[in-house]
Design a protein with these regions (language model features):
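Bacterial N-terminal signal peptides that target proteins for export
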Residues: 1-10
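Charge-rich, well-structured scaffold segments of protease-associated domains
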Residues: 2, 87-236, 253, 303-304, ...
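Sec/Tat signal peptide C-region and signal peptidase I cleavage site
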Residues: 18-22
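Short N-terminal segments immediately surrounding and downstream of signal-peptide cleavage
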Residues: 23-42
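M16/MPP (pitrilysin/insulinase) zinc-metallopeptidase core fold and M16-derived inactive scaffolds
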Residues: 24-26, 51-113, 156, 179, ...
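Short, solvent-exposed loop/turn elements at domain surfaces
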Residues: 38-39, 46-49, 59-62, 273-274, ...
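His/Glu-based metal-binding/catalytic segments typifying zinc-dependent metallopeptidases
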Residues: 42, 51-53, 237-293
Length: 439
């Protein structure tokens, strides 16, 4: 999605990380109007990053209106209040501020960055964006054309094709079963009124999470929150219920004329609030978490040369979790690639990990964690995400302790519980040799 990112050279320095991640002191702030936010004060530079998250995301689309929330979020930068698109862009640029908007299946996000000297004017402009979007027809037609161009491109991308097929097989008629940016047919049919309806569904206080980092005090943030958000409705549209993961083991081949097949694979996963999550997180790092030491990378790439990269990853969405992976291989090698992945999945479930693998995974994951705190905007995003995941406010300080507390017995027990080789389904897009759909 396009987003306004008018960050000047003067503002670039404002993305420097806080000095020491372990010293990040998070405060919970409640505004006079009752809006809660998490704050990290940093007065070393005259700059603040603000992250707003609204739970529900594109899953709030009404039946027959798929893509409405995604398109609505893309239009937020196209004018607000008395300002049409060009005047809005000029106003934002004059403030040396940056606003960006995004929508995924669980969340609509607004990220804002502004200098302290321009804070009040930037917040006034952002307030108009949230409360008074214009959704002018010319802007709607322009952004719709961009979304449609993206959808046409996605229709030719093997990775996107695989993703859409997997989502439909895994989640069926649930909103997770279709992509949030919609289809060519659904997006073409969306109207200006649909944008106002989507806006009303999303922007409410009962699904709001706020993170702030930078040159702002608790009192100043409280006043800002009320100015910006106090007039939002108390409640938005109902959030859909949990999604049943219905995908079963097997192979689905999608014919596509390309010399290399793309495979997306997975089965039911584990939610973020599951007490086994940290063991699962370490387990995934060992199986296919991205390093060259992972079992999948070792067996599929290093030993057999079947691919340049193979990965597995946990996808703990709000309403339903899957455990997934991806790989690409030549049409003549993809059948062997699938077989090796199936074998390693089953082997790890049956035999577990070694003491050394667990120790190495702990070292990697605890060492990499501080690198996430690489700028005020990133930290503000983390603060909002922590709240959405219902994590405690001291999570930053205790997270690595939780990783290190996982025992060998615990991780191997979890491996047997969450790795389900018989339920592993492969979506293969290409013209694979020696591989056919099983259902």
């Amino acid at each position: 999605m396009k987003a306004i990112k008018l960050i000047t050279a003067a503002m670039a320095v404002c993305f420097l990380a806080l000095p020491v991640w372990a010293e990040v002191k998070i405060k919970e702030v409640t505004s006079p109007g009752g809006i809660t936010a998490w704050l990290v004060e940093d007065h070393s530079i005259p700059f603040t990053a603000l992250e707003l998250r609204f739970r529900g995301g594109t899953s709030l689309d009404k039946p027959g209106k798929r893509g409405a929330t995604y398109l609505m979020a893309g239009l937020l930068e196209e004018g607000a209040g008395p300002l049409p698109a060009q005047d809005y862009a000029r106003a934002l640029e004059s403030l040396a501020a940056g606003f960006s908007y995004d929508a995924d299946k669980d969340t609509v996000s607004i990220s804002a960055q502004f200098l302290s000297e321009n804070r009040n004017r930037a917040i006034d402009l952002l307030r108009q964006t949230i409360h008074e979007p214009r959704f002018d027809q010319d802007a709607l037609d322009r952004v719709r054309a961009q979304v449609l161009a993206g959808l046409r491109s996605d229709a030719k991308d093997p990775n996107d094709i695989a993703g859409r097929v997997f989502s439909q097989m895994a989640f069926g008629d649930h909103p997770y079963g279709t992509e949030g940016n919609g289809t060519i047919e659904s997006v073409t049919a969306l109207t200006r009124q649909d944008m106002f309806d989507a806006h009303e569904a999303v922007f409410a206080r009962d699904r709001l999470y706020v993170g702030a980092v930078g040159d702002i005090t608790e009192a100043e943030l409280g006043a800002l929150l009320d100015t910006l958000l106090a007039d939002l409705p108390a409640e938005g549209a109902p959030i859909p219920g949990p999604a049943d993961v219905t995908i079963e083991g097997g192979v689905t081949v999608v014919d596509y004329d390309t010399p290399q097949s793309v495979a997306l694979f997975g089965h039911i996963g584990i939610k973020r609030d599951d007490p086994r999550y940290f063991a699962a997180y370490l387990l995934n790092q060992i199986l296919g978490g991205g390093s060259f030491d992972s079992r999948l990378m070792s067996e599929v790439r290093e030993k057999r040369g079947l691919t340049y990269g193979v990965y597995s990853y946990l996808v703990p969405r709000d309403l339903g979790a899957v455990y997934m992976g991806s790989v690409a291989s030549a049409n003549g090698k993809i059948a062997e690639t699938v077989e090796v992945i199936q074998t390693e999945w089953a082997k790890l479930a049956a035999e577990g990990v070694t003491e050394k693998e667990l120790a190495d995974a702990k070292t990697y994951l605890t060492g990499a964690y501080p690198l996430r705190f690489d700028g005020n905007s990133r930290i503000a995003s983390i603060l909002a995400g922590m709240q959405m995941d219902d994590l405690p406010i001291d999570y930053v300080a205790t997270r690595n302790d939780k990783v290190n507390a996982v025992t060998l017995d615990e991780i191997n027990k979890v491996a047997a519980e969450i790795l389900l080789p018989d339920q592993l389904h492969f979506i293969v897009v290409g013209r694979p040799e020696g591989l056919q759909s099983t259902n």
